[in-house]
Amino acid sequence: MTAPAELWAVWERISRRRPLVHCITNPVTVNDCANALLAAGAHPFMAAHPDEVEEVQLRADALVINLGAIAQLDSIGKAARQAVACGHPIVVDPVGVSASSLRRRSCIALLKEFPVACVRGNGAEIRALLEDTGTAAGVDAPSEDAASAHEIAAQLARRHD
């Protein structure tokens, strides 16, 4: 568990640096994602068109991929390649991987191809990625208990380290 002092130090660094975060997300969550980044002290940039994502990523400090934007796989690949070339961290939100084999396969491919710094998902999503199975009904599927969630997250991290 991360100590509150460590979390506060990270928060202060973000607030001082004010990183530009390139987000490829779905239209349903775009406003929430932008506002969360603004509240954390970052600058969000929502860009998903395949002709602009590489240019945007050149100027960004990080890339956040939300698999709710599954129709943007071409853009996601281009942005991720540019992020790697620039040394930018990549965060993946595996929205719906427990309910969609397309999203699950796409996310597993991302994890194999790119050095993803963080997978931000609930227990059902992480388990679906670890076991390559889908059993949940949707993105709000019941999560694991804390101990189980920690263990499956650690297993997924070891697999894709």
Which role does the model predict for each range below?
Residues 1-78, 82-84, 89, 151-161:
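Small-residue (G/A/S/T)-rich helix-start motifs and N-terminal tracts that mark the onset
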